[in-house]
Amino acid sequence: MILFMTVVLISLSIFFFSTFSVDATTASVEYGYVKSLFREIAFSIPEILNGQTIYTRHPSSLVSLGFKKIPLNLTIQLELGNNTLVTAFNKTEFYALTGGIRRNVLEDVRGSIVYGVNQSVVSEIERLALVREYYYNGWTIIELDTARVYCSIYKVGDSNYYLEIIIADFGGYYNINDPPTVIGTGSIRLRYESYYADIKEFSPVRNLTIIFNQSIITLKDILPSNHSIDPVSGSLTVRIVYKKIAVLIS
């Protein structure tokens, strides 16, 4: 009887260990797939904003996809040529796409940046998206967000400049003003339509301030080194483009 119980206990131990090992392997594989997927989506954000639709499927027995709100105060203030100060843009939250799995699959639980740079203003459109991963309260979480500003400035003539600011966020698939649409977890579709865009243009602009939470970015921070706008003969045109990407997770 003792021998029988010993055999049963050993068999159960082997069974549970094997099940745990298979489960852990599945978790690692699925999370790795979603991690690569988020990286590819982040890399493709410029193409999506130009009208390309992305549709992918992924294994989803253990990993789940969704979204979260990111509280953020983003304000763009402009001083126009007639000394008028206007708030050209204001936004208090962004949406991040998220993936999560209820176990730790990270080598470093402090987390890391998978793609992009953690900056408030970027000068490359490819850096508009940020992907980071971290461990929190029993979950390994990966997030993709576009909560930053892309600035591109061009010199036109001797002392005239044209500044384009692009801001992007995620929205609902059937109603762009809603949060990202989540009705499942096995696939993700992202698309952008030009009529989603909100475009404003201001000229002449004497100064510019971007408030990003506690950070303040001025025109001097955006202008290339050794460049300045002549207060008499120079001019600055600012174009602000706000785009929303429709998301369907199903």
Which residues are covered by each model-predicted region?
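N-terminal single-pass transmembrane signal-anchor helix
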Residues: M1-T19
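Broad, structure-driven detector of short, well-ordered beta-strand segments within folded domains
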Residues: V63-F67, L78, I165, L236-K243
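Beta-strand/loop motifs with alternating small/hydrophobic and polar/acidic residues, enriched
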Residues: S13-T140
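Intrinsically disordered, low-complexity regions enriched in Pro/Ser/Thr/Gly and acidic residues
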Residues: G81-T237, A246-S250
